[in-house]
A protein has these predicted regions:
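Extracytosolic ligand-binding ectodomains
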Residues: 2-12, 26-425
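Bacterial N-terminal signal peptides
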Residues: 13-21
């Protein structure tokens, strides 16, 4: 073969090879795997007597217990313990073994309204929460997401009308306070709509008659939470307040001001300030001596601030915060000694353990994330209207179209949040 032809041939061969490589790099497969989903099984290795099983139960060695358990066992306490373990390990399997109810269970139709550009970080977490809740029930369900992209009155009205056209009987709307106000500008609320992210008291521009009877709210009442902490402020204790430099910080600052708390020093804290917080103080600085510190900063900033205050000789007598810091990340960011005088108000109660465990499998936190918690309450409220005898997982009530939470004060002792027995020392 002449040199020129060979050169052209190899050039074409090289081009073909590169094209194939590019196709392989950009190709995506949308075929579902034929493999069945994973199912946990525990293999029995050695015999275990009744006393042996009871010892394993008392020691909470769940995997050893399940591997040794015999289905012919007649001990009721062992039976109950075994069933509880299986419900956590394989909740879907247990649900499939539950006899079908004779009563009619309607298909659940649910619309999710969200402006992705505004609340995108909540979207996946809330969806996982709702899926976890519905998967612990036996009903068929259909969830459809309607993205308004933003919170302008026009976009929200257009998206709401799309939901109405599809005739969904219930809507969960992930909106900010401004989003709710914009929705009410042009839109008539004709379908029961639940907003898990806003508290009704935030809508100060809307009087009671102007709000639709079909609009419900599930947001945390930060004013009530901060009000519970006032009794922890000593008469001669100067109050220092650190607020986040974002919207939530400004909102909490306004609430603190409305409660007539005399603040000696107030400061908005950015992430840059939080990381170099201790540079403003010397070890023997008496700035925090006998003071009460109110932390209206999110968990990461609070962790940075507390860990650096812990290096000072004089520390605040008490550190007070709200739901914003009821987060296990705070326990990891600080030492127990840095938060021994920290008091946090929390509205979330212990709900159905099976639901909590199932949600955690979908990376949804129902113990500490109040938006997830509130969203699940909204779904349950809807299901309860379909069936008055519906077995509820949450104990919160609905008053004047607002979820009423049971706020309690916790301390961050050791590596967990522990409920205080009394509200005062």
């Amino acid at each position: 073969m002449p040199y020129a032809l060979r050169k052209r041939f190899f050039k074409r061969l090289l081009l073909f090879f590169l094209i194939v490589c590019m196709i392989n790099l950009h190709a995506k497969s949308y075929l579902f795997s034929p493999l069945p989903p994973a199912h946990q099984q525990i293999i029995k290795t050695e015999p275990c007597s009744l006393e042996c099983l009871k010892d394993l139960m008392l020691q909470n060695q769940i995997f050893s217990f399940v591997s040794q358990y015999d289905d012919n066992n007649q001990d009721e306490s062992l039976k109950t313990y075994y069933k509880d373990i299986l419900s956590k390990l394989n909740p879907v399997s247990i649900a499939s073994q539950t006899p079908a109810k004779e009563s009619y269970e309607p298909k659940i139709e649910l619309a999710i309204l969200l402006p992705k550009k505004v609340v995108g970080r909540y979207a996946i977490s809330v969806m996982n929460t709702l899926l976890a809740y519905l998967n612990t029930r036996n009903n068929d369900f259909n969830i459809q997401v309607f993205d308004s992209d933003e919170e302008s009155p026009e976009k929200l009205e257009q998206t709401y009308k799309e939901i109405e056209k599809e005739k969904f009987p219930f809507i969960i709307a992930l909106l900010t306070k401004e989003g709710v106000e914009n929705l009410l500008q042009n839109t008539t609320i004709s379908t029961p709509t639940y907003v898990p992210t806003v508290n009704k008291t935030q809508l100060e521009n809307h009087t009671e008659p102007s709000l639709s009877e079909r609009l419900y709210f599930g947001g945390i009442d930060y004013k009530e939470q901060l009000g519970m902490l006032i009794s922890f402020i000593g008469h001669n204790s100067p109050v220092i307040e650190y607020d986040d430099d974002g919207l939530i910080g400004e909102r909490l600052r306004q609430i603190t001001e409305s409660l007539n708390i005399e603040v000696k020093h107030q400061e908005n804290i950015s992430y840059k300030q939080a990381t170099s917080f201790s540079k403003n103080f010397r070890k023997h600085d008496a700035f925090f001596k006998n003071s009460t510190l109110i932390l209206n900063t999110p968990t990461t900033k609070s962790g940075l601030i507390l860990s650096q205050i812990g290096l000072l000789e004089y520390k605040p007598l008490k550190i007070l915060s709200t739901q914003i810091n009821f987060n296990p990340s705070l326990l990891l960011l600080t030492q127990p000694k840095d938060r021994k005088n920290l008091f946090i108000v929390n509205a979330l109660q212990n709900s159905d353990e099976t639901l909590i465990e199932y949600a955690s499998l979908l990376e949804s936190d129902l113990r500490h994330d109040w938006v997830n918690y509130s969203s699940a309450i909204g779904l349950e409220m809807f299901l309860n209207t379909l069936d008055p005898h519906f077995k509820k997982s949450f104990q919160e009530s609905l008053e004047d179209n607002q979820v009423r939470y049971h706020n309690q004060i916790y301390q961050a002792l050791g590596y967990s949040f522990e409920l205080m027995q009394t509200n005062k020392e």
